[in-house]
UniProtKB/Swiss-Prot annotation:
Known catalytic reactions: N(2)-formyl-N(1)-(5-phospho-beta-D-ribosyl)glycinamide + L-glutamine + ATP + H2O = 2-formamido-N(1)-(5-O-phospho-beta-D-ribosyl)acetamidine + L-glutamate + ADP + phosphate + H(+)
Species of provenance: Shewanella sp. (strain MR-7)
Family the UniProt entry places it in: In the N-terminal section; belongs to the FGAMS family.
GO biological process terms, semicolon-separated: 'de novo' IMP biosynthetic process
Gene that produces this protein: purL
Residues annotated for Mg(2+) binding in this entry: D677, E716, N720, D884
Pathway: Purine metabolism; IMP biosynthesis via de novo pathway; 5-amino-1-(5-phospho-D-ribosyl)imidazole from N(2)-formyl-N(1)-(5-phospho-D-ribosyl)glycinamide: step 1/2
Alphabetized Gene3D superfamilies for the sequence: 3.40.50.880, Phosphoribosylformylglycinamidine synthase, linker domain, PurM-like C-terminal domain, PurM-like, N-terminal domain
Top-level taxonomy: Bacteria, Pseudomonadati, Pseudomonadota, Gammaproteobacteria, Alteromonadales
Subcellular location as annotated: Cytoplasm
Keywords: ATP-binding, Cytoplasm, Glutamine amidotransferase, Ligase, Magnesium, Metal-binding, Nucleotide-binding, Purine biosynthesis
Protein name in the entry: Phosphoribosylformylglycinamidine synthase
GO molecular function: ATP binding; metal ion binding; phosphoribosylformylglycinamidine synthase activity
């Protein structure tokens, strides 16, 4: 084992935060220094030149410190027996650079702690601050790290002696293995193995437990129900299916695959043919949808829990039909009170929590980062979400008790597209190869399906930890590229049948695959790729290692499939063959035995059906006491409630522009305020048709009325999607995620009531279908504290996600109030019809109460009338702005619209009934519309004609104040800036805790700056002019290499931009160049695309660059290309970072910087303002002086120069091509207008001859006007960024 020092691991402010944590823990620590240390497992000693090459590969990030560190060494490494994603990708780079003697690279962080002598207890406390016990260990000596590379002998399976010891043997195994088997399931297994006359093996029991867990089998939703002594006619699932039976319209696949599919639009699908040439293929682009939860793992270890939750849902989408394409994501979190240090709110009590789960604050600090990081690296935009905090002692259905989300909801979902011929699974032919695609088996995530089916507190802590998985999104991206290549082949697609590997690992996935295909299978255990040879058969078969799919491929198609995988560098293995007989055999060649030998029907067939005999309960809760509520104080509290407050800290960490197909994300208007009601995507680059998603959830209402909570969730999702141009209810399909504390008094009957309200009544009445969903039935946390039994039980929680097909994405209405549209009026549509019920509201919550009566959708006709009227208005462009009324009531709706439009309001409540508090803060269904004053009465009359109450409530005000009156009486008045400050303080506090606090403060101050102009546009050219048109007509299109490495994810939109400019865009993978299949000699131009090559493990873009510099063939190819006078190149984002590391082979690039970690130390996804500079760059000719917004999505975009002199030389060279600026056109020095902290706002630079240009922002994602989060009304189809690509075509003549 070689040990190689690396760069400092922590920035100054990270060290400072660590020191503060030490002080808070009363540790006598004076100083901490941390640096990366690399470990190389070698097959033989390296030669001197090889050692030097390895050291160069492992040189990245900040400069390595020259000093010898002092103090107590605490060396944090990945847990022995696991292989970190960093390791697998860094090892790939070493191999691609020709270092075959490197068996494996691994990395740890060496902490050197200078302190007074620490007691054993203090050392344990310190270790707790330095490592994540879920995935890491702390060593006191570098030499001890060789345990990471230790190989152990495989362990055999174990049998459970049922034949001799009977049922008792299985009862003991059930507890010891954490199988969560029910009594009747134990009977079933004993009976079947006695019949088979053999003992079950541990692997078979674990496989059965996973396949039949509540998590996988949804026993409660399929159960027979008796409520209050009366047998119920339908199961929960049958009531959900009733929505499909009533309205099957436009549904192509429901209840039988990894996701549901509905009919989409016809558009030109853009992808490369088998020769790599991109083009449009006009065809139906059907829409798939799925929403998952990952609650249990997120409670234990939020980052990997949320990351793998997102990853699993993305795999569900990709594994739909015979392979499909995930497109856009949504997310959601429900947690208990945050109790932010220094910002604890009056309603946040201190009830405690068990040690084995983390706090709500930790979940919301780490969980969203995990989910966002996975989506970012995979390359799926995260466009929609919800966030609720709830934890309160209330009088509900079970009397007075604490209700809340100690067991959180972590929701991950999204939509994708699928080809018509691939919607249905194919036939698994007898003899077909059964394949696992993706990463290796690792000893992690054991028993996740069974563990998540228990209430938190029933399983032991070790089992809890074992049931959390780890994430490697770059591997999943590679697998998705394989799936993409397969579906792009149309009827020649080699995939017959595909499933993702999720709960239960291969033990659930392979049996499900063959069973669903009507086949059996013979498998060889030792063919499963595994990085841990000491694993037992159970661990190999049942672990939940992520980023894996199982699929069947006909034997004759195996060479084609193999070639695709090798090109994409996606690992795969043939593990078995499909058989005619529905029997499952798993052979182990190492021990020469069969750990599994079972008829499939024993595993998946006739397991006992559950019966639920339950009693209903009625909630009795006093009315909300209004007499002590002051409107001004209520405003302060409600705007500080995380459910209502600014959610920037959850949004800017997630890429929202990747694919180039995003039309509407969470951010709205020139000031990019996160208040959007729905997300909208374009179907493709050649159409205005698209897709929309929204969410709805009103979970606290269930503490008063289960049915109302469910109806309001459905209704809210419709109110949120109503601003998109969809047309008909029948074009909207819903996903329903049901969370409940099954077995808790009153909850089971309440769940039945809620499902019935939606499945049997509301949805059929509105022609809405629920073709997909998920349930999580163990939403209760129990523990002991100071000798007392404590519980926190979640409300019954229904989260609805609505998916619609959009007719014209240009018609989408957002909450941005417009002060440039002449005289306008604000209308309130009130579906609550003046009832003003306050039960379960945010107002009640912030005063520590629940209230007595929940708001409800009393008549479905009200929602139908509203939606149909709204859709006519949207299609005619009669609505200027729209925002629904929900959490925080009318007051919140109005001020959020004011924030988005940067305007004041003059509101008059006199048309509304009730007290001030009721009128402002009730959360009945409704919405506010801004319309032209000339149209206001006519529009109000249209709503009235549809049976929907509609009131004039005011207009915009020029004084930047929000003033609310009741006739002449002033009810409330405050400046917009003061309200925005209140609303944004929660996100500021969270950002300051999690990110660079200096950046967080700068952003908070910018939100309070009345003079901030937001995004502005000033162009020096006409964007509607196509300067390339004369050249395109000349004949053959010049060839453009659309270059990607493993992990790159922005290549398709880049190909589309160059295609529109008249180039032949060709897909070129680095493996094509390294293998010699393709030469750069063929191309006039090259573009290195954005993404996460090798997951950015050796510095962003650096691993990619080193695989070129240290590979003879690649270095030669690229050197020759850059030396050619006629060639040109563009590097964007990851491609920019990569090319900046190729300075030694790019003429005229000596002055270039390298790109390092953003100043905020956070991935930044922003829509930022830049100005084009005067430079020789061929891409920016004729554009100098133009100021316009552009998509920014990166974690390492800070331009770092070797010295101040080097920066001065770069400035003097005249090659700076782009700078971040503010709305006045001044160089942006403050965050977030300068999102990465680069000196002088630098974000684009070129060679001295202008042939090679680097830029961190993404012009390819915004070359269409509709892909810009905000733009002036007068822009046409092409945004100004299209000029760049056309300039490249003009340059070639």
């Amino acid at each position: 084992m070689e040990i190689i020092r690396g760069a400092p691991a922590l920035s100054t402010f990270r060290v400072q935060k660590l020191m503060e944590a030490c002080v808070n823990a009363a540790l006598p620590v004076r100083q901490i220094y941390a640096e990366y240390v690399h470990l190389a497992d070698l097959s033989e000693l390296l030669e001197t030149n090889e050692r030097e090459q390895l050291e160069k590969i492992l040189t990245y990030g900040p400069a390595i410190e020259a000093h010898t560190p002092q103090g107590l060494l605490l060396f944090v490494t990945p847990r022995p027996g696991t292989i970190s994603p960093w390791s697998s990708k860094a090892t790939d780079i070493a191999h691609n650079c020709g270092l075959g003697k490197v068996k494996r690279l691994e990395r740890g962080v060496a902490y050197y702690v200078e302190s007074d002598t620490l007691t054993v207890e203090q050392q344990q406390t310190l270790k707790g601050l330095l490592h994540d016990r879920m995935v890491e260990v702390v060593l006191d000596d570098f030499a001890k790290a060789d345990v990471l590379f230790k190989r152990t002998e495989p362990a055999p399976f174990k049998s459970v002696n049922v034949l001799a010891e009977g049922r008792r043997a299985l009862e003991v195994a059930n507890v010891e293995m954490g199988l969560a088997l029910a009594e009747d399931e134990i009977d079933y297994l004993v009976e079947n193995f006695v019949r088979l006359n053999r003992n079950p093996n541990d692997i078979e029991l674990m496989m059965f437990a996973q396949a039949n867990s509540e998590h996988c089998r949804h026993k409660i939703f399929n159960a027979d129900w008796t409520i209050d002594g009366e047998a119920q006619p339908k199961s929960l699932f049958k009531m959900i299916k009733n929505t499909f039976e009533t309205t099957p319209d436009h549904v192509l696949s429901a209840y039988k695959d990894n996701a549901a599919v509905m009919e989409g639009s016809v558009a030109g699908r853009f992808f490369p043919d088998p020769n790599g040439v991109y083009s449009y293929h006009t065809e139906p682009m059907h829409v798939l949808m799925k929403v998952e939860t990952h609650n249990h793992p997120t409670a234990i270890s939020p980052y990997p829990g949320a990351a793998t939750g997102s990853g699993g849902e993305i795999r569900d989408e990709g594994a739909t039909g015979r392979g499909s394409k995930p497109k856009a994501g949504l997310t959601g979190f429900s947690v208990s009170n945050l109790k932010i240090p220094g910002f604890v709110q009056p309603w946040e009590g201190s009830y405690g929590k068990p040690d084995r789960i983390v706090s709500a604050l930790e979940i919301m600090t780490e969980g969203p980062l995990g989910g966002a990081a996975f989506n970012n690296e995979f390359g799926r935009p995260a466009l929609l979400g919800y966030f609720r905090t709830y934890e309160q002692e209330v009088s509900s259905h079970n009397g007075v008790e604490v209700r809340g989300y100690h067991k959180p909801i972590m929701l991950a979902g999204g939509l994708g597209n699928i080809r018509e011929e691939h919607v249905q699974k194919g036939e698994i032919t007898v003899g077909a190869k059964l394949i696992v695609l993706g990463g290796p088996a690792m000893n992690i995530g054991l028993g996740g399906g069974a563990a998540s089916s228990m209430a938190s507190g029933q399983s032991s802590e070790d089992l809890d930890f074992a049931s959390v998985q780890r994430e490697n999104p770059e591997m999943e991206r590679r697998c998705q590229e394989v799936i993409d290549r397969c579906w792009q082949l149309g009827d020649k697609n080699p995939i017959q049948f595909i499933h993702d590997v999720g709960a239960g690992g291969l033990s659930n996935a392979f049996p499900e695959l063959v069973n669903d295909g009507g086949r059996g299978g013979i498998f060889n255990l030792r063919n499963v790729p595994s990085d841990e040879p000491g694993m037992s058969p159970l661990e190999i078969w049942c672990n939940e290692s992520q980023e894996r799919y199982v699929l069947s491929v006909a034997a004759e198609d195996l060479p084609l499939f193999t070639a695709i995988c090798e090109r994409e560098r996606a690992p795969f293995a043939v593990v078995g063959e499909a058989t005619q007989e529905q029997h499952l055999t798993l052979a182990d060649s190492h021990f020469d035995n069969n750990p599994i030998d079972l008829p499939l029907e024993v595993l998946l067939g006739k397991a006992p059906k559950m019966s639920r005999n339950v009693v209903s309960a009625k909630a009795v809760s006093p009315a909300l006491e209004q007499s002590n509520i002051d409107v001004k104080e209520a405003v302060k509290r409600i705007l500080s409630l995380p459910t209502v407050a600014d959610k920037t800290f959850l949004i800017t960490i997630g890429d929202r522009t990747v694919t180039g197909l995003v039309n509407r994300d969470q951010m709205v208007g020139p000031w990019q305020v996160p208040v959007a009601d729905c997300a909208v995507t374009a179907a493709s680059f050649d159409t205005y048709a698209g897709e929309a998603m929204s969410m709805g959830e009103r979970t606290p209402l269930a503490l008063l009325d289960f049915g109302a909570s469910a109806r309001m969730a459905v209704a809210e999702s419709i109110m949120n999607i109503a601003g998109a141009d969809i047309g008909s209810f029948k074009r909207i399909k819903l996903s329903a995620n049901w969370m409940s504390a099954a077995g808790h008094p009153g909850e089971d009957a309440g769940l039945y009531e809620a499902v019935k309200a939606v499945g049997e009544e509301l949805c059929p009445e509105l022609s809405l279908t629920i073709p997909v969903g998920k349930d999580s039935m163990s939403m209760k946390t129990a523990w002991q504290q100071d000798g007392a039994n404590k519980t926190v039980t979640a409300p019954m929680s229904l989260v609805i996600s609505a998916f619609g097909v959009v007719q014209d994405i240009r018609n989408t209405v957002t909450p941005e109030l417009r002060s440039d549209k002449g005289e306008t009026s604000l209308l309130l549509v009130d579906l609550g019809a003046g009832k003003n019920r306050l039960g379960g509201s945010c107002l009640a919550q912030v005063y520590g109460e629940l209230g007595d009566i929940a708001p409800d959708l009393d008549d479905a006709a009200l929602l139908r009338g509203f939606f149909e009227t709204m859709q006519k208005l949207v299609a005619k462009k009669s609505v200027i702005a729209y925002h629904d009324r929900s959490d925080g009531g009318l007051f919140t709706t109005l001020v959020e619209m004011a924030f988005a439009g940067n305007t004041g309001l003059a509101i008059d409540l006199s048309a509304l009934q009730g007290t001030d508090v009721e009128r402002l803060f009730n959360e009945e269904l409704g919405g506010v519309l801004q319309v032209s004053r000339a149209d206001a009465e006519l529009i109000a009359a249209q709503f009235a004609q549809a049976g929907v109450p509609c009131h004039m409530i005011g207009s915009l005000a020029n004084d930047q104040r929000v003033t609310i009156k009741d006739g002449a009486r002033e009810v409330f008045s405050e400046t917009r800036v003061a309200l925005r400050t209140l609303w944004s303080e929660t996100t500021y506090r969270m950002q300051a805790l999690r990110d660079n606090p200096a950046c967080a403060l700068e952003e908070f101050k910018l939100k309070q700056d009345k003079t901030d102009l937001g995004l502005t546009v000033n162009l020096s050219f006409d964007p509607s002019e196509d300067v390339a048109a004369p050249y395109i007509l000349k004949g053959a299109a010049p060839k453009m290499a659309i270059l990607r490495e493993q992990g790159v994810n922005s290549h398709v939109e880049m190909a589309a931009a160059f295609d529109r400019a008249g180039f032949e865009s060709r897909d070129v993978h680095m493996s094509d160049i390294l293998s010699g299949r393709i030469s750069l000699e063929e191309f006039q131009g090259l573009v290195a695309c954005g993404g996460f090559s090798y997951g950015d493990v050796l510095g962003a873009g650096e691993g990619w660059a080193k695989s070129i510099l240290f590979n003879e063939r690649a270095r030669d190819e690229f050197s020759r290309f850059f030396e050619r006078d006629s060639s040109f190149a563009l590097g964007v984002c990851n491609g920019c970072q990569m090319l900046s590391n190729l300075k030694e082979i790019i003429p005229g690039s000596e002055h270039w910087p390298r790109f390092v970690r953003n100043r905020s130390e956070r991935f930044e996804a922003r829509f930022s303002l830049v100005e084009v500079q005067q430079s020789p760059s061929l891409f920016f000719q004729g554009m100098a002086g133009s100021r316009m917004p552009i998509a920014v999505s990166h974690g390492e975009g800070h331009a770092e120069f070797a010295s101040a002199q080097a920066l001065a030389l770069a400035e003097a060279s005249g090659t700076i091509a782009l700078r971040f600026v503010n709305g006045n056109g001044e160089i942006a020095t403050q965050y977030p207008q300068n999102p990465n902290g680069s000196p002088n706002g630098l974000t684009g630079i070129c060679t001295t001859d202008g042939r090679v240009t680097l830029m961190m922002p993404h012009p390819e994602r915004v070359f269409r006007t509709v892909a810009n989060s905000w733009h002036p009304d007068n822009w046409g189809e092409d945004s100004p960024w299209m000029r760049m690509f056309r300039n490249a075509r003009v340059n070639l003549g």
